[in-house]
């Protein structure tokens, strides 16, 4: 059976290892090679491929060292500047990995070359979304604009509600503190925060999250919600006439929160 395990890196990154009981492994966004090499050795795994969501160094910094030890395919966006990519991808492509395959979704906003990978693994839908969607949050807009990012998030919102979300950072508690500021009376936010505080106190990741639950407490997926819009209006001093305006206002608020 295939399982998905987090490999912690740096202060708050997760490199996701998709591994089969036959000893094959694919890793997502290896910003650091050393923890991946240790994980492979300790679990007697053979690296079969590297999946990249975007070009930032904390997601790609370990690629060349891994390739020096394991010459495997590197998957990434077709117009990315990452030189190590050997299998360029675009929207709708499928990546065949052993007994399963992942669909490529273009999700720009955080960066222009950002893609996500979605598919059924071990009987459940899974999404590897890098820095586009976080639990209770979303990525900063380093290269894209609010309309672009909101379009990407809307694309992800349309995935099945039982989709497990494997994002690349342990930002959940920080994001939930912001969500409480946006929706101070939300039972869903408060419940999720208590759950995650308990997990982190035991050293357990808050991920994967579940998409159908995120839609109830992630303010960046709730730009149409009247409470979110009202708080965006108060903080920004603008009318927030559209959901994209609301999204832009709360993203700017989060940047300085």
From Swiss-Prot:
Residues that bind Zn(2+) 2: 58-59, 131, 169
Family: Belongs to the metallo-beta-lactamase superfamily. Glyoxalase II family.
GO BP of this protein: methylglyoxal catabolic process to D-lactate via S-lactoyl-glutathione
EC top class, as a word: hydrolase
Keywords on record: Hydrolase, Metal-binding, Zinc
Organism: Hahella chejuensis (strain KCTC 2396)
Covalent S-S links between cysteines: none
EC number(s) from the headed UniProt entry: 3.1.2.6
Described function: Thiolesterase that catalyzes the hydrolysis of S-D-lactoyl-glutathione to form glutathione and D-lactic acid.
Quaternary structure note: Monomer.
Residues that bind Zn(2+) 1: 54, 56, 110, 131
Name of the protein this chain belongs to: Hydroxyacylglutathione hydrolase
Gene3D superfamilies: Ribonuclease Z/Hydroxyacylglutathione hydrolase-like
Pathway(s) of this molecule: Secondary metabolite metabolism; methylglyoxal degradation; (R)-lactate from methylglyoxal: step 2/2
Chain ranges passing through the membrane: none
Entry superkingdom: Bacteria
């Amino acid at each position: 059976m295939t399982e998905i395990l987090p490999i912690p890196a740096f202060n708050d990154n997760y490199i996701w290892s998709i591994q089969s009981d036959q000893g094959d492994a694919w890793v997502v966004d290896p910003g650091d090679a050393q923890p991946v090499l240790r994980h492979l050795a300790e679990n007697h795994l053979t690296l079969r491929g590297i999946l990249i969501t975007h070009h930032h160094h904390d997601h790609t910094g370990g690629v060349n060292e891994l390739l020096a030890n394991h010459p495997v395919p590197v998957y990434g966006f077709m117009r990315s500047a990452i030189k190590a990519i050997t299998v360029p991808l675009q929207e709708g492509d499928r990546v065949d990995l052993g007994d399963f395959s992942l669909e490529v979704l273009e999700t720009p906003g955080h960066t222009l070359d950002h893609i996500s990978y979605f598919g059924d693994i071990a009987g459940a839908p899974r999404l590897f979304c890098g820095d586009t969607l976080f639990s209770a949050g979303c990525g900063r807009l380093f290269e894209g604009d609010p309309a672009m990012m909101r379009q990407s998030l809307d694309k992800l919102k349309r995935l099945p509600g039982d989709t497990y979300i494997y994002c690349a950072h342990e930002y959940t508690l920080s994001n939930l503190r912001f969500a409480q500021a946006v929706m101070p009376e939300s039972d869903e936010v408060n419940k999720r925060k208590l759950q995650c505080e308990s997990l982190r106190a035991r050293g357990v990741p808050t991920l994967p999250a579940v998409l159908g639950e995120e839609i109830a407490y992630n303010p960046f997926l709730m730009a149409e919600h009247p409470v979110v819009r009202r708080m965006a209006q108060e903080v920004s001093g603008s009318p927030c006439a559209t959901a994209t305006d609301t999204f832009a206002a709360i993203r700017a608020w989060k940047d300085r929160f």
